[in-house]
Each structure stands twice: as structure tokens, then as C-alpha cells.
Amino acid sequence: MAVFTAVSDADLALWMRHYDLGDVVAFRGIPSGIENSNFFLTTTRGEYVLTIFENLTAGQLPFYVDLMSHLAKHGVPVPAPVARDDGTLFGELHGKPAAIVTKLEGAAQLAPGVEHCVEVGQMLARMHLAGRDYPRHQPNLRSLPWWRDTVPAIAPFVTGEQRALLEGELAHQAAFFASDDYAALPEGPCHCDLFRDNALFAHAEPDTGHSVRLGGFFDFYFAGCDKWLFDVAVTVNDWCVDLPTGALDAARADALLRAYQTVRPFTAGERRHWGDMLRAGAYRFWVSRLYDFHLPRAAQMLKPHDPGHFERILRERIAHAGALPETHACN
């Protein structure tokens, strides 16, 4: 969520004429992230986020904004797109698609504990089930075809050892994706980027018995239809990892996975290929971070992520695959 496209006060005033959101009180860019231009917007009616989409086209955008609306209507705490005066959920700003969504309650938990992982696991499963009847289809745009296109572009910037790992893992994943087992894995709309900075936590209500309360998931603009297990693997690789080493934190991983399967139990096929999917989740973000680091786009506010973090995670997942916990109730 960097700022690639600047928005002046005059630009904003013209844009806001298409919304019934009252008067603008505050407006500022959001520096984190690397894909779209994002701004916090406060009006006399509430708090919102304005996003200008730098890569998604107007033809692609309905999948994402309609998915958020669908999930919100099914009780999943996600940002709700705000309709314009013509009833549409997005328009054009500086020649690019743009939308306003509601701002969720809470703050990111960048040092999550077991209790946060339980909340995330349960809600991720609820989100997957809520998306089963979503009528639109958009593949995960950062999956195998994108990896195949991107690895040759980043190969000149990496060491020989890194290139061997990139190409070897690409071959491993291509074989996995082509298998009958992969085809049989449960699938549907996935977040595909559920890192700890894409979820918010609010204070738990008194007398609920919970120490934390999930405010919701946001930033669905990498979402796509994929295997649900991939979404789980991406989430575990961020929420349940020892940051210095990339190794899984057993307590957090166990808590998240057990919580998930109290809502949607894993299939036998998912259990067989958990290790492959952990590797796929790590590989996707190693490739994208290498690309963003070595071939960056110009931006007013941009903080590229360290590619080495997901290289460490991938090497760890190859060495130590782990297994999904057996099903039983989560405390």
C-alpha cells in the first residue's frame, strides 16, 4: 500500500462529489505495501480507505470489490466498498480504477500470540466457506504462470545458488500443480496475502471469555480463486514463523491450524500435500519480493520488503515440511 499516484486536494474534492460521505476532515497517504496507492480518508460520516489500483484493470476489479461485498454480507469482517452516486463500487481517478471502502476497527498485531492465531484460523475457514457460492471467478494472478514469467526476469540479479533454488523449486511446483492430487484439493476464493499487517484486532468485549477480538481482514487486492490450502499455507508462513530463522513456531502453527479445522476439517489430500503447499506459499513471496526489490516501480512512498526473509522460509520448509494436526476441538 504505497503511494504511486499523488492526489491533490482539488483532485479529492472532485472525486468526493460522487459520494454521499459528508465533508473531508483528513486525508493522508499510507506508506506500507508495494502494489497500489492507498490513503486514509476521514469525513464527517466516518473513516474510510481510498485505493487507486496501479495494476488491476477496470475489467478485473469487479471480482475484488464484489468479493468483499459478498463476504461482508455473509458475516465475514472485511472492508465494505462504498457505492458511488451511480450505484457502482469503483470509478476512475487519474485514469486508473479507484474505490473507497470502509475502514475496519482495531490495529495490526505484528507480534501475534497463540490467541491471535486462533482468531485468524477460525475466521479464515469461515471466509473460505462463505465464498463457496461467490459467482465470479478470477485465478490467483501470482500463481504458477506468473512464477514462470517472472523467474527469468529476476535470474540475472541473484547468485548461482539462488538461481538453482528458484529453478528447482519451480520445477517441483510445476509437477505438483500438474498432479491429480492437486486438482482434487478443495478450492474457492482466497485472500492469498493474509499477512499479519492485513488483519486488525480490537479490544475484546468484557465477559466474552476471549482475550482478543479480530476486527477483520483487509487488502483483498491479491485475492483469487485458488486451493484453500494455499491460503492457509501463506497465512501460517507469516503468522506462525520465527522471524530470524524462518522456522515455524509450533505453538502458533498448531493453534491456527486446529482453529481452522474446527470450522472446516482438512481432507486427506490436503494432509498429504501440506509440505508442498507450505513451499508454494514461501516460493510465491520470495519470487515477488525479488522482483519488487530488483525491478522496483517509482513511487512517492515505498518500502520494499527483504527478499531474503522468504528465501529462508522456503529453505526451512524444504528441510522441515511438518504435518497438519489431527482434528479435535480447539480450546
From Swiss-Prot:
Pathway involvement of the protein, from the record: Amino-acid biosynthesis; L-threonine biosynthesis; L-threonine from L-aspartate: step 4/5
Signal peptide (from-to): none
Pfam families tied to this protein: APH
Enzyme Commission number: 2.7.1.39
Family matches, as CDD domains: HomoserineK_II
GO MF term (any one): ATP binding
Matches recorded under InterPro entries: Aminoglycoside_PTrfase, Homoserine_kinase_II, Kinase-like_dom_sf, Pseudomonas-type_ThrB
Catalytic activity: L-homoserine + ATP = O-phospho-L-homoserine + ADP + H(+)
Domain of life: Bacteria
Protein name listed in UniProt: Homoserine kinase
Keywords: Amino-acid biosynthesis, ATP-binding, Kinase, Nucleotide-binding, Threonine biosynthesis, Transferase
Family classification: Belongs to the pseudomonas-type ThrB family.
Top EC class for this record: transferase
Gene Ontology terms: biological process: threonine biosynthetic process
HAMAP family per record: Homoser_kinase_2
Keyword Nucleotide-binding: yes
Organism: Burkholderia pseudomallei (strain K96243)
